[in-house]
């Protein structure tokens, strides 16, 4: 795929909200803002766009690049990724159960956190498998297990 500025701008325009949401879901440090992370993801998308081979959907590929960039940044900085309440629609009222659930999701490990977040954003098992590099069966099993654990924690 030939990379040109127009193609890149159109791709970013189509997926900017998803990219922003992913960037916002990781707390890096006081030195890194969501905007900094967003720009880092854009650079990685630009660098990788020429190698995008269309075996996966564009949306899946962008999600994977953004997630991998954020995980790499998190490792470089030495902080754990943290899901913020803004990753999900804000409840119409302050609901402590909602925030408890967000904290429980935040406490999960990779790749389960990525699987849960991608599932919440409507990705199919096949798309999540491409994002994580796992098989569809592994995604299904890990999601089922993670959701079961979340239900158990929530009901305690």
Language-model-derived ranges and their functions:
Residues 2-10, 20-40, 51-53, 131, ...:
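Short, charged helix-capping/linker segments at alpha-helix termini
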Residues 51-53, 64-84:
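Arg/Lys-rich amphipathic alpha helix in sigma70-family domain 2
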């Amino acid at each position: 795929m030939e990379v040109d500025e127009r193609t890149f701008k159109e791709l970013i325009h189509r997926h900017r909200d998803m990219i922003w949401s992913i960037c916002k879901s990781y707390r890096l440090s006081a030195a890194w803002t969501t905007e900094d992370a967003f720009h880092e993801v854009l650079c990685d998308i630009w660098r990788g766009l020429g190698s995008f081979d269309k075996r996966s959907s564009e949306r899946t590929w962008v999600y994977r690049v953004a997630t991998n960039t954020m995980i790499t940044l998190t490792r470089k900085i030495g902080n754990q990724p943290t899901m913020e309440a803004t990753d999900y629609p804000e409840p119409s009222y302050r609901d402590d159960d909602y925030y408890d659930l967000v904290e429980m999701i935040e406490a999960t490990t990779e790749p389960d956190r990525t699987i849960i977040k991608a599932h919440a954003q409507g990705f199919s098992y096949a798309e999540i498998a491409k994002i994580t590099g796992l098989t569809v069966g592994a995604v299904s099993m890990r999601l089922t297990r993670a959701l079961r654990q979340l239900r158990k924690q929530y009901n305690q």
